[in-house]
């Protein structure tokens, strides 16, 4: 019997319980002061498209080389507490042959893993999605934990449109998020709960506020039903922003105010931290909004942090494609700059003057 087979068998034995102390410790570590999460969990297709867009021929090796370059950046661990990986990436190695999970762990960065299998059409609900991946999740989590992962992510997609989201869409996605969270915690992984209300559309910020409130309330109700240990979990929500086609865009200050208000009304105080998604915002907007939230005089019970993908990587990818031969030095510098800017936003100390 192989080690993986043994672990899979063990995971199904009765009496296995979550380690609440471990979950709470790792959840707090992920939102430790001045640090946030790098979302490097793009699917093979998405990452290939981004490579092709900057003139790099897509392949498994190209995806590995780009990410290995990011993870070799000197000093980024001061601003990055965890990295979300894709299934392909968690099985890959650095240029020197060291497993990527080992490289991250030795820097004091927790490896994480995307465990959902994508958003699919919700039957009988045109234009709406349900995220799949619960089948076999327990066994996958057992394997990922053995490979070094200590947290996981599952993304639900909520679209605003004519008559949507429906209550069926909200409930089914909230239920899936809760079941995912319970399974992850059973297997020792901190679940990052990501119900994303998309920016697509012409809706205003008040509609975004209402829909975000609805999915957050539904999700935490389902988490309670499923026995999810909230102090051992994190939330990855969207900010309250008008649809990208809306003519009435609100100020950065209003985004910060409305976002904190929405969270205060709908998120349990026991949750240790909130790690925002960037959701198509510009690099600087994502940083500025987080900075303003952390500058507010209103006290909130959670750490407010980041779990950004493109907002941390976009400039780094462009520079890597232009200077592959320079050992990725300019790419590493671009990544480190954005990481440091968001680190400053954690304490409300960022300013546009620092962007250079």
Would you name each region that the model predicts?
Residues 118-122, 157-164, 198-202, 242:
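Conserved radical SAM core fold
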Residues 6, 10-147, 160, 248, ...:
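Alpha/beta catalytic barrel-like cores
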Residues 115, 156, 195-197, 237, ...:
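Short glycine-centered, acidic/aromatic-flanked micro-motifs in structured strand/loop junctions
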Residues 145, 156-158, 162, 223:
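Structural motif corresponding to the C-terminal cap of alpha-helices
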Residues 68-72, 97-103, 110, 126-151, ...:
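Alpha/beta enzyme core
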Residues 160-171, 203-206, 281-289:
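Active-site-adjacent beta->alpha loops and helix N-cap segments on the catalytic face
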Residues 2-4:
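Position-driven detector of the extreme protein N-terminus
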Residues 59, 154, 193, 235, ...:
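Conserved, mostly hydrophobic/aromatic
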């Amino acid at each position: 019997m192989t080690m993986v087979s043994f672990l899979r068998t063990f995971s199904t034995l009765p009496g296995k319980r979550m380690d609440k102390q471990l979950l709470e410790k790792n959840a707090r570590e992920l939102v430790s002061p001045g640090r946030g999460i790098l979302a490097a969990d793009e699917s093979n297709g998405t990452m290939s498209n981004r490579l092709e867009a900057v003139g790099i021929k897509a392949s498994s090796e190209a995806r590995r080389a780009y990410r290995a370059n990011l993870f070799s950046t000197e000093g980024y661990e001061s601003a990055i507490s965890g990295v979300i990986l894709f299934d392909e990436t968690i099985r890959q190695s650095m240029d020197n042959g060291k497993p990527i999970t080992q490289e991250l762990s030795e820097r004091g960065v927790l490896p994480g893993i995307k465990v959902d299998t994508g958003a699919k059409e919700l039957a009988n609900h045109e234009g709406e999605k349900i995220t799949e991946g619960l089948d076999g999740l327990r066994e996958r989590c057992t394997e990922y934990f053995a490979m070094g992962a200590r947290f996981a992510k599952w993304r639900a997609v909520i679209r605003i449109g004519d008559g949507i989201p429906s209550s069926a869409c909200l409930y089914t996605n909230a239920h899936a998020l809760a079941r995912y969270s319970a399974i992850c915690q059973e297997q020792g992984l901190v679940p990052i709960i990501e119900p994303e209300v998309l920016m697509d559309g012409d809706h205003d910020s008040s509609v975004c506020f209402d829909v975000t409130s609805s999915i957050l309330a539904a999700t935490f109700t389902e988490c309670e039903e499923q026995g999810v240990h909230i102090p051992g979990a994190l939330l990855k929500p969207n900010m309250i922003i008008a649809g990208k086609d809306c003519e009435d865009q609100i100020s950065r200050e209003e985004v910060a105010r409305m976002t904190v208000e929405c969270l205060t009304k709908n998120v349990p105080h026991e949750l240790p931290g909130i790690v925002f998604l960037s959701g198509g915002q510009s690099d600087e907007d994502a940083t500025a909004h987080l900075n303003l939230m952390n500058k507010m005089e209103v006290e909130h019970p959670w750490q407010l942090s980041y779990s950004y993908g493109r907002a941390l990587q976009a400039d780094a990818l462009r520079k890597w494609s232009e200077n592959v031969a320079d050992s990725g030095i300019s790419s590493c510098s671009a990544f480190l700059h954005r990481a440091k800017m968001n680190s400053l936003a954690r304490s409300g100390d960022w300013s546009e003057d620092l962007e250079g």
